[in-house]
A protein has these predicted regions:
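Short hydrophobic core segments
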Residues: 10-12, 195-207, 356
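N-terminal Rossmann-like FAD-binding beta1-loop-alpha1 element of flavoenzymes
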Residues: 8-33
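Active-site substrate-recognition segment that forms the wall
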Residues: 23-27, 52, 82-87, 184, ...
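Helical element adjacent to the flavin cofactor pocket in flavoenzyme catalytic cores
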Residues: 141-198
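Glycine-rich FAD pyrophosphate-binding loop
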Residues: 26-46
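Dinucleotide-binding Rossmann-like beta1-alpha1 core, especially the glycine-rich loop
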Residues: 49-129, 298-300
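C-terminal catalytic lobe of FAD-dependent flavoproteins
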Residues: 151, 284-389
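Short beta-strand to alpha-helix junction loop
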Residues: 64, 94-103, 142-160, 286-291, ...
Length: 389
């Protein structure tokens, strides 16, 4: 499809977040053009597990966004759930030690205070949830709201639905610069031509910082590498998304070095997905078998039957990490006409639809469903000023 000369909004990025922005903007009646340097869902959305989680989030802005996104996945978008294999499987967080269970109990109380459905599980009852779980665990917590989608299908079908409302999608179309009028962004220059638009949304994931830099603004999104292992197809031996309680700490950590914690979940196809790892190594793509071995050993400690299961493959990708662990969502006052929707790290699939709806609201002058100030693009400027004071 030829590049349009004009659009109401250009969305940069055809992953899950960009697709959600396009869907809700088109639904609001805007003429939308989506551009991506590669294929649909070619970045983080193709290298993740498709998590829609509340369990791994501390009470605060990110959890509020997760709750809002849940209302959309389960409400307005529920009729399309079969398209992206929405599965409300629930999540089980397990503690190996009593001290860890005490911390999990306190976290669950804070989450419950803001409306999260969570059930504490004592050690004797863990196998009611997961019969094949290892013996000797100290306890856990079950989160019925945790869910999963097939992330590439979610991105592809959200874009297909957006197309049905008039949006256009242009892959292999790299943004090289912005059209400017003074400080304002008024369009994009791409490898395939120029699109004039009064609004541009930076939904470029791990490349969000590079896109922001083209506009002369700083959005410190960094790539954080992670691996996933995939087993041979099996009967249903893992019922829920199951992970060790230390995973929550790793998600919230700013440590740049390698961190691993066991995450195990089944899929509709019978394979089991095994994670997780986190490390900041730039865009270094090589596979480290030692990381995979560490992940496998920790997964076996949760589910001993995995010791005899064949791992068919592994894949890795880069999560768009922000230093304060909050995404960047909303208009950028430093470059009027530029919006951001990036920096969701490992939560982008789950948070995508809430992000898209919030972006569409601000694009159309409608009051957003929640306060966007914690996600403001310019917040990092004040943090730097405080650091240098």
């Amino acid at each position: 499809m030829n590049l349009p000369r004009f659009a109401d909004v250009v969305v940069i990025g055809a992953g899950a977040v960009g697709a959600a922005c396009a869907y809700f903007a088109a639904q609001a009646g805007l003429r939308v053009a989506v551009v991506d340097r590669g294929p649909i869902a070619g970045g983080t959305s193709s290298a993740c597990e498709g998590n829609i989680l509340v369990s791994d989030k501390e009470a605060g802005p990110e959890l509020s966004l997760a709750q809002y996104s849940q209302t959309l996945w389960r409400g307005e978008l529920a009729e399309f759930g079969h398209l992206w294999e929405f599965e409300s499987k629930g999540g089980l967080v397990v503690s190996a030690k009593p001290g860890t269970q005490e911390n999990l109990t306190r976290l669950a109380a804070r989450q419950r205070n803001v409306g999260i459905d969570v059930e504490l599980v004592d050690a004797a009852n863990l196998k009611d949830y997961e019969p094949h779980l290892a013996n000797g665990m100290a306890g856990g917590a079950f989160y019925p709201q945790d869910a999963q989608v097939q992330p590439m299908l979610a991105a592809a079908h959200l874009l297909r639905l957006a197309r049905g409302m008039g949006a256009t999608v242009h892959t292999n179309t790299k943004v090289t610069s912005f059209v400017r009028q003074g400080d304002a962004v008024t369009g994009v220059v791409t490898s395939q031509g120029t699109i004039a638009a009064p609004a541009v949304v930076n939904a470029a994931g791990t490349w969000g910082a590079a896109i922001a830099e083209l506009a002369g603004v700083d959005v410190p999104v960094l790539p954080r590498k992670g691996y996933v292992m995939v087993t041979e197809p099996l009967p249903e031996l893992v019922r829920h998304k199951v992970y060790a309680a230390e995973y929550v700490d790793n998600v919230a950590s700013s440590y740049a070095g390698l961190q691993t914690s066991p995450v195990v979940e089944g899929t509709r196809g019978g394979t089991i997905l095994i994670g997780s790892s986190r490390e900041r190594v730039g865009f270094e793509k090589s596979v480290n078998p030692l990381v995979l071995a560490e992940m496998a050993n920790k997964a076996i400690a949760l589910f001993p039957f995995l010791a005899d299961v064949l791992a068919l493959r592994s894949y890795s990708g880069f999560r768009p990490y922000c230093p304060d662990h909050l995404p960047v969502i909303g208009p950028d006052p430093r470059a009027p006409g530029l919006w951001h929707a990036c920096g969701h790290e490992g939560a982008g699939i789950g948070l995508s639809v809430g992000t898209g709806a919030l972006i569409a609201a601000t694009l159309t002058g409608t009051a957003p469903a929640m306060d966007l100030s914690p996600f403001a693009p310019e917040r990092f400027d004040s943090l730097r000023q405080e650091a240098h004071a």
